[in-house]
Amino acid sequence: MIQRFRFGLPLPTDSVVQEIPVSAGPVPFLTAEEDGWAYRMAPDAIVYGLGEMPRGINKRGWHYETNNTDESEHGENRLSYYAAHNFLLISPADGSECIGIFIDFPGKVSYDIGYTRHDTLRFATAEPNYALYLITAPTAAEVAKRFRQLIGPSYIPPKWAFGLAQSRFGYKTEADIREVAAQYKANGLPLDMICMDIEYMQDYADFTVNKERFPDLTKLSADLKAQGIRLVPIIDA
């Protein structure tokens, strides 16, 4: 079962592809608080989700933020990394019904997943304009399946994207890229793609190319492709 609740005037994000009617009744499972929501967790419940985040697969016992911002340092004590995936899956150890929580909101969301109180999950959005989806199912796998149906299937990457990639920060010139390809070939190593970080840009601005250091990015890409190597420039957005 999927229920949708709307608060304020949510900004359209196109994150959801299914038409789910807005539920008028009270929000089940959750308790409204002054700045968000609380959920009472079973003692051995496991909490999955939030995408690429610090710590382990079970998110219980820490607090997090999702805000789509650069994080220059990675470590166990960080509150977030780059991306925002505002989906939680709560799986009770006793085999009772599993619950999925999806917050459709493009801004900052804060989570306290058993950090302040081991038995309490709390979350709050920076603004009171968002859509909240609750998904219930007998198993965690079924919750995940229904969530995927809600947001639509992922794109299918090209076959070469499953190959070997050489990626690092610090390739400053076209010559650096060509040298990487040459050294792989000289050492008899397979190479399917070279990923470039922000050094190829003009003043680190998206959708720009530093013409002094990369005078002809189109030709560089074509030359590498002729060798069976794809050039993958980062878009730091």
Task: Label the predicted regions.
Residues Y155-A237:
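Aromatic-lined carbohydrate-binding/catalytic grooves of carbohydrate-active enzymes
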